[in-house]
Amino acid sequence: MQIYPLRLLPNKIDFDFMNFKKVSYTFSIILSLISFIWIGIYKFNFGIDFAGGIVIEVRLDQAPDLPKMRGVLGKLGIGEVVLQNFGSERDLSIRFGSSSEENLMKNIELIKGFLQSNFPYKFEYRKVDFVGPQVGRQLIEAGAMAMLFSFLAIMVYIWVRFEWYFGLGILIALVHDVILALGFMSMTKLDFNLSTIAAVLTIIGYSVNDSVVIYDRIRENLRKYHKKNITEIINLSINETLSRTILTVITTLLANLALILFGGEAIRSFSVLVFFGIIAGTYSSIFISAPILTMFVNRKFNKKVIER
């Protein structure tokens, strides 16, 4: 019994991706500029993690219906309300924004009264904290450092595995993906919170994985085809890995679509941003990180890459 791999494309596909190199560069630069301008004008919709707010810790006499509670509290008109279990399923953390410390007590009493009148649970309020914007600034700095260190680690890895200009190609693609992801967040008013920082790091990982697969095939083809120039090698390598790329993006998008549809409001920002990032990362690995090698690589420099 033979098992045949699933193929969405014929074995011998020969699409000239490199012919669209200038078009893709121009398109990416325009999108990046639009993202920068949009972010500069409209900023981000910072969530409680970064903007500050109120945290109420409460214990209930039974496990609460979180989706129903989120829906009811969303009607209060006080902005984003985040409900999460911690410890046991009866322990609940309620977080919501507060424009100032003056209306702190007003919003707390509003939440307590709303919960008491809409749910049959017994509420034991254990702690109420006010999280100021200073904490949010520290979290933003920590998130930025996490992305910076991930960029540096990826650069070192690609440099060791391939060569420095391969790392530079991936770095340019990653910066492109992050800029587009941040622009998308600003345009769609997704909550900018800790989960979206995790989403950006997920996008970085996905984009690197896609690019490394193509780079690996480029290195193999440099060994096999000594008479082809670098443009032909890159085109061949992208075409040979295209079926794998399409299958990967379809399966990951379908899995992420399930999170968007059924994951609930708590992970909505994460799942929507990752969905967009998968598309952006696939585009950049094919039309940016691979074609950009033609600016640095030619036959006389390929010996180091082939030997690794």
Swiss-Prot record:
Pfam families: Sec_GG, SecD_SecF_C
GO biological process: intracellular protein transmembrane transport; protein targeting; protein transport by the Sec complex
GO terms assigned for molecular function: protein-transporting ATPase activity
InterPro entries assigned: SecD/SecF_arch_bac, SecD/SecF_bac, SecD/SecF_CS, SecD_SecF_C, SecD_SecF_C_bact, SecF_bac, SSD
GO cellular-component term (any): plasma membrane
Transmembrane segments: 28-48, 140-160, 164-184, 194-214, 246-266, 272-292
Location of this chain's protein in the cell: Cell inner membrane
Keyword vocabulary terms for this entry: Cell inner membrane, Cell membrane, Membrane, Protein transport, Translocation, Transmembrane, Transmembrane helix, Transport
Topology of this chain in the membrane: Multi-pass membrane protein
NCBIfam families: 2A0604s01, transloc_SecF
HAMAP family, per database record: SecF_B
Similarity field: Belongs to the SecD/SecF family. SecF subfamily.
Purpose: Part of the Sec protein translocase complex. Interacts with the SecYEG preprotein conducting channel. SecDF uses the proton motive force (PMF) to complete protein translocation after the ATP-dependent function of SecA.
Protein name according to UniProt: Protein translocase subunit SecF
Phylogenetic placement of the source organism: Bacteria, Pseudomonadati, Pseudomonadota, Alphaproteobacteria, Rickettsiales
